[in-house]
Regions:
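Transmembrane-helix signature of polytopic, membrane-embedded enzymes
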Residues: 96-124, 142, 162
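Membrane-interface alpha helices of multi-pass inner-membrane proteins
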Residues: 164-178, 219-227
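Membrane-interface anchor segments at the N-terminal boundary of transmembrane helices
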Residues: 76-88, 387-482
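Juxtamembrane membrane-water interface segments immediately following transmembrane helices
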Residues: 41, 47, 212-385
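Aromatic- and kink-enriched transmembrane "portal" helix at the membrane-lumen/periplasm boundary
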Residues: 59-62, 78, 82, 115-141, ...
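Extracytoplasmic catalytic/substrate-binding loops of multi-pass membrane glycan-assembly enzymes
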Residues: 34-49, 53-76, 393-397, 412, ...
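Transmembrane-helix motifs of polytopic, lipid-linked glycan transferases
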Residues: 83-106, 143-151, 452-455
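Membrane-interface transmembrane helices that cradle and orient dolichyl/undecaprenyl
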Residues: 146-163
């Protein structure tokens, strides 16, 4: 620190300490004070606060909550969770903007701007709450996604495989936290192709074709292997819950103390448990009706079965019953169709126009809930031997998968049309807001943002004097946005919180491209024009 006259001048190190200290305070204030100062629970939150093999729930967040329940108790753990999520978000956002500041030599005011833009994904439920104050996976995934972007940018900028390996590791973490983020394996595949093709190596230019082949083949293997590993991880997690008594008892002790007390008082050892299980089976054999009632809810399904079935059932028509030759499946389809049609969750009830996507998302999203018990009741009434079979879950899933795939094949054109109708709103979610009175204008603004960003990116790639890192940054954001929008619209049913991960990063990369354009061309031309 140097005192010059009456003014105190700070050196670079002191300025940086003061600057990053202010960012820490701003981040903690934003994540812990702004919005709600209480934990915010949603309908989905219950799926994470209990250790259960629930469809679509990945292992990381329930285990994270279980650890906090164990450390802080059921009365205080939610407050600990939102503090931990807030601190993690603060660390990740500051690391992200610091990476950009160091790479692009940003002014302090520019870094502040980038910091506030980076907060945008966390504000989808404002003014009620920040994402870090919610007991949902987004409390962790939005923050960790910035670490993914950091290592992915390093991989793209340096063309080094060690950074790519880091981005792949972050993808595994994110996919184990949120199932939809398996999409990022596709992004990693594209980045791998880019690195292989652009990496400087000794050899002839003709080897570019060989590199492209290696990149495509390697990217495909990475994508498929990643999805396979995550599926096995999820299956292992569910198997742990169902079969590992030590883990189940520990979870019961932490999450349900009353049930644990009952368990201890029962003094149930393995021999007694086996005797009671044998007695229960004998009772079921003697009382068929009792057996049916007990087994009706004993089924498991996968997220993929539900997605295929829901997307297909939304496209259903009454005459589609004739598509199924099997009498059991045909009867099941009729029962499912009647349930869905009664709730007006088919495509025929969707409004036309720009808001059609809302009815599509609502219909597809509710079909699974509407039809959850229909197969069980149908089997119990008409084919009770299926319910009593040890393969009940497998038979149920096979029938639902067959129905979903058959309907999608029969109405594939309509399915693509409805998917296409969801794309515009999905793209809007990635970079802009959906405002009812000016909804058409929202489409036009989004189109302008994407086209202008694409034009600026291409110009940077063409101009060899320009810093191509800005263009590579935008290419990563646009590419991941396109992959997310298409896959989520095709496979899942788009929700805003699935699509806003790159919201702030898009405007940051857009600003960097504009800055590069100004510094490289417009400013010099403006100076020459003034002199003239």
């Amino acid at each position: 620190m140097v005192e010059k006259g009456k003014r105190i001048q700070l050196n670079v190190v002191q300025k940086n300490r003061l600057f990053y200290g202010s960012l820490v305070l701003l981040a903690l204030f934003s994540f812990l004070v702004v919005g709600s100062r209480e934990p915010v629970l949603f309908d989905d939150s219950g799926a994470y606060t209990k250790i259960d093999p629930i469809e679509g729930v990945m292992p990381v967040y329930p285990l994270f909550l279980l650890l906090n329940q164990y450390l802080f108790g059921l009365d205080r753990y939610l407050y600990a969770v939102i503090v931990e999520q807030g601190i993690l978000a603060a660390v990740c956002v500051i690391l992200f903007v610091r990476t950009l500041k160091d790479e692009f030599h940003l002014h302090y005011w520019e870094t502040y701007l980038f910091f506030f833009l980076s907060l945008m994904p966390f504000t989808t439920e404002m003014p009620q709450s920040m994402a870090t104050q919610q007991i949902l996976t987004e409390g962790l995934s939005y923050a960790l996604f910035y670490l993914f972007v950091i290592v992915m940018l390093k991989a793209v900028w340096t063309k080094k495989y060690v950074w790519f390996a880091g981005s792949l590791a972050m993808t595994f973490v994110l996919a184990a936290l949120r199932s939809q983020l398996q999409i990022l394996f596709a992004v990693c595949s594209v980045i791998f192709l880019y690195i292989v093709c652009r990496r400087k190596q000794e050899g002839r230019k003709a080897c570019v074709w060989i590199r492209a082949f290696i990149g495509i083949a390697g990217g495909l293997c990475i994508c498929l292997a990643g999805i396979f590993v995550i599926s096995r991880l999820t299956a292992g997690y569910k198997n742990l819950i169902k079969t590992n008594e030590t883990f189940s008892v520990f979870a019961m002790k932490v999450q349900s103390p009353e049930d644990y007390e009952t368990y201890l008082l029962s003094g149930m050892d393995a021999e007694k448990a086996a005797e009671e299980e044998a007695a229960r089976k004998k009772e079921e054999e003697e009382d068929r009706e009792l057996a049916l009632k007990r087994r009706l809810s004993r089924f498991t399904t996968s997220q993929y079965v539900s997605l295929i079935f829901s997307r297909g059932m939304y496209e259903a028509d009454s005459e589609d019953a004739y598509l199924f030759e099997d009498e059991i499946v045909r009867g099941l389809y009729v029962a499912l169709y009647e349930a869905v049609d009664e709730e007006k969750q088919r495509y025929v009830y969707a409004q036309n126009g720009l808001w059609m996507w809302k009815d599509i998302v609502g219909g597809v999203g509710q079909v699974g809930k509407t039809c959850l018990r229909v197969p069980s009741l149908y089997y119990a009434e008409n084919y009770p031997e299926i319910v009593l079979s040890d393969q009940y879950s497998e038979i149920r899933n096979a029938h639902l998968t067959l129905i979903g795939i058959t309907l999608l094949k029969a109405h594939f054109g309509r399915f693509l049309y409805h998917t296409f109708m969801m794309l515009p709103q999905a793209f809007i979610c990635t970079v802009f807001f959906q405002v009812g009175p000016i909804y058409l204008l929202c489409h036009l603004v989004t189109l302008f943002l994407y086209l202008s960003a694409l034009a600026l990116m291409i110009r940077e790639f063409i101009d060899r004097k320009a810093d191509q890192k800005c263009a590579e940054f935008m290419a990563l954001i646009l590419g991941s946005n396109v992959v997310m929008v298409i896959v989520i619209s095709l496979v899942f049913f788009g929700q805003q919180r699935y699509l806003v991960y790159n919201f702030g990063a898009f405007y940051i990369s857009y600003y960097l491209l504009l800055r590069e354009l100004w510094n490289g061309h417009i400013r010099d031309k403006a100076r020459k024009w003034r002199k003239a």
